[in-house]
Amino acid sequence: MKPLVLTAFALVLAVHALDASISIPQAQAAQRPLERFTVTADGHPLAVWARRPAAPVGAVLFVHGRTWSARPDFDLQVPGLSRSVMSTFAAQGFAAYGVDLRGYGATPRDKTDWLTPKRSADDIVSVLTWIAEQHPRLPKPTLVGWSRGAAMAGMAAQMAPDRLSNVVLFGFAFDPDLKFVSIDSDKPLKLKNSAAAAESDFISPEITPKAVISAFVEQALKTDPVLVDVKKDDEFNDFVPAKMETPTLLLFGSDDPGMVMDDAGKMFAKLGAKDKQMVVLPGADHAAHLEDTHDAWVAAILNFIKRPASRR
């Protein structure tokens, strides 16, 4: 996946500063079954995948990035390893959901054959609304977006702050003083995805077992054989960090080649939310949630969700 970045530093929490009381129960991680739901957004069916404990304490929606859909990104099955984000969150007591945006995974393209940022953000809001309806006694869902999905998650949080309780922007930051531009083709290209593209995010062999890469390539090409056609990237200019009021976690790996530290610090400083954190995972890259940094990535998000309120 190629991260969406245009291309000061206010707060960084190193992973070793995270709450040590959070442990990731690997043996239980695969116990919850994978469920599939269909959520209708503006008349279009969206595939939503879930792993849910019997009595969840919260709900989380994961939004994939540019190239691959929810299952390879957030429910990766690796023999002998626990790398499914949804399984790990379910084992921690959270109802974990992942959406396939239009054209991705099990969700068909719409009649336009294109996907735009605003269309995606509107669909994310529809799924957030549906999740809240499934869990009326729980807090509103936490929204987690990866790479391009983080930009769309930011748009959704800004559009409908009443539909979520937190937003996590993972593997994405930009200079708020610059503008996004659109470079659109005349017609949808429907290019075939490749094994090389599936391998491209795994750039750190010291934290990336070959089994993870092999599993991702196989599962990603199976779910997403054709690249979705996107346009109107200038709509990302609707995401204005200063207008973001939802509690926000900015999360990325120290070795993510798509992240510019100065841009991350500048964006973090301009976030309108008073309740915000930035966490840098040492040694991690763009696919931190799938590599040996999986547990640290999960712990960063759980710590943010479970952060205590002020009290005397």
Where in the sequence are the language-model features?
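Glycine-rich "HGGG/HGxG" loop immediately N-terminal to the catalytic nucleophile
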Residues: R71-P72, D100-L115, H286
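N-terminal cap/lid segment of alpha/beta-hydrolase-fold proteins
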Residues: I24, Q28-A54
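Short, surface-exposed "cap/lid" segments of acyl-processing enzymes
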Residues: A55, V60-F94
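Alpha/beta-hydrolase active-site loop
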Residues: W114-Q134
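Conserved alpha/beta-hydrolase "acid-adjacent" motif
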Residues: P257-D263
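Short beta-strand/loop motif that positions the catalytic acidic residue
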Residues: M244, L250-F252
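Alpha/beta-hydrolase fold nucleophile elbow
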Residues: H135-S147
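Catalytic histidine-centered segment of alpha/beta-hydrolase-like enzymes
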Residues: A284-H294
